[in-house]
């Protein structure tokens, strides 16, 4: 763990890989573990990464690129990452770093809530001759 989530919170694809959700889910899982075990050293590493390395793959609204490698489409993101970022911010807030609540609130108000569909009337089920479950009730899902 110390080789990947270093004390400076730096990010390097050689250490972390390029799939952003793999990185953010480990970050939020380590925050959960640190909270559960009351491990301040581990929480400090999570905080250092949140404050430093995470910014190479996220923006102010919590949007996060899907792939951090060279050549990915910079317009492709993954909402799972955003959920991990919010979860980590809330844990850091609970840990006493209350300024992270503001980050979580901004992400929820400015990214997660506006991205939710309220009117699904325009969504039609696609042709589905093979009765694939993923193509049934697409809108309501």
Region locations from a protein language model:
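Glycan-recognition and catalytic cores of secretory/periplasmic carbohydrate-active enzymes
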Residues: 1-141
């Amino acid at each position: 763990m110390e080789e990947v989530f270093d004390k400076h919170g730096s990010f390097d694809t050689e250490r972390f890989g390029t799939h952003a959700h793999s990185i953010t889910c480990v970050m939020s899982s380590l925050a959960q573990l640190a909270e559960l075990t009351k491990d301040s050293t581990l929480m400090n590493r999570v905080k250092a990464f949140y404050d430093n390395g995470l910014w190479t793959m996220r923006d102010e609204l919590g949007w996060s690129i899907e792939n951090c490698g060279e050549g990915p489409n910079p317009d492709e993101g993954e909402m799972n990452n955003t959920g991990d970022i919010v979860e980590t911010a809330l844990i850091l807030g609970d840990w006493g770093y209350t300024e992270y609540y503001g980050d979580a609130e901004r992400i929820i108000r400015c990214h997660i809530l506006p991205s939710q569909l309220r009117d699904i009337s325009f969504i039609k089920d696609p042709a589905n001759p093979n009765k694939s479950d993923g193509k049934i009730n697409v809108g309501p899902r």
